Amino acid sequence: QGGLPFLTDCNTLYPGSRKNALEHLTCAQLNGFWPMTTGCQVIIADGLRGTDEVEVPVPNGEYCKTAKIGRAIMDADIFISLTHFKGHESTGFGGTLKNIGMGCGSRAGKMIQHAAGHPEVQQSLCRGCHRCAKECGSDAITYDANNKAVIDQTKCKGCGRCIGACNFDAIYSQCDSANEMLDRKMAEYAAAVCAGRPCFHISLVQDISPNCDCHCENDAPILPDIGIFASFDPVALDQACADACLNAQPLPNSQLGQNLAKPGWNCHHDNFKDSNPNIEWKATLEQAEKIGMGTRQYVLKKV
């Protein structure tokens, strides 16, 4: 008779409309993910407050020996991921591995992944526009007497949303390796989710925005629509999607296009890095392949 599918996600680390199951379900409904439109139920995997988790071994884990994953996700017999592939201000791009690793982590699991470093403000670059404070869900950003942003590290969750919100590169990670550490931990969390059961993965490489989908102020797409990719191997899938984006022509009136048009811009010949220069997107793929989750080699079959 087939399986009984359900749609799922875990609560976010930062406050907002997905910080608990009740508001999360309302958010899902407002975005069209509801039984009346999809034909299946929606379950928030880590429960009402994001504490319903399972500690799962990470196969060959180097940075995380165990992962804290939403219980409903680990209770499922089969795992299918559906990902919107886009740019990302901390990880370079948000693909299948990020969707699984960060998306399936409980709130505590997300905190572990983000723990390498909290953002800081280079006040000489701050324009006092207050955009970062509006984006911060933790009320961690205030302004001093000179109207320069100040981050309260006791309130900061380390989610990095303020980095993407700043148009003037005034906010950066305190730890030089923080983004790379985040990438590698995400890969290991994704491996914990997928290990030991059938999995299949689909990526929609469309509306390729420069930053994470959690940004309400996200900018115009940086690249034209490319298509829909699918694979049993999430590592090969992310590599194929990334390669397709690297070979695409940047859209002129986008964050990427405008960066490339700046006089004296230090071009990286990398559409992700030229959109968000302080990222190291290859680390996720390297780590996932290293611990045996999949391979970066692929054969592209067009249909």
Name these PLM-found stretches.
Residues 1-303:
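Extended, low-polarity segments enriched in aliphatic/aromatic residues
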